[in-house]
Amino acid sequence: MANQETDLQQRIRLTVGALPGFRAWRNNSGKLPDPRTGRWVQFGVASPGGSDLIGYRTIEITPDMVGRKVAVFTALEIKTATGRATPEQRRFIDHIRAAGGISAIVRTTADALRIATEPFRGI
């Protein structure tokens, strides 16, 4: 049986990835031993604690905001209805938000669509 969180993550990635101006990629993360040295090597963006999906949402800046488009870094941490974020994941979410990005815990495709389409107020 497939992992529920993995299935949810795939549905969310495909759903928000189909929206205009929104791109999301799976952030594979973890650690493995280097076969040459035996040292553990971490991989993934902001590992440990990096969100499951990372990407950007293109925001059109209104004329009073100079009139340019910018890509806003977006990190979605996928959790099932009962899943809990680790302290490292919470810190990463807080860091992205503090830096002006979009980051959230997402439990459904509806959550992801809301985050991907609601007016951006981060600037």
Show which residues each predicted segment covers.
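Catalytic phosphate/metal-binding cores of nucleic-acid and nucleotide-processing enzymes, i.e., regions
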Residues: 1-123
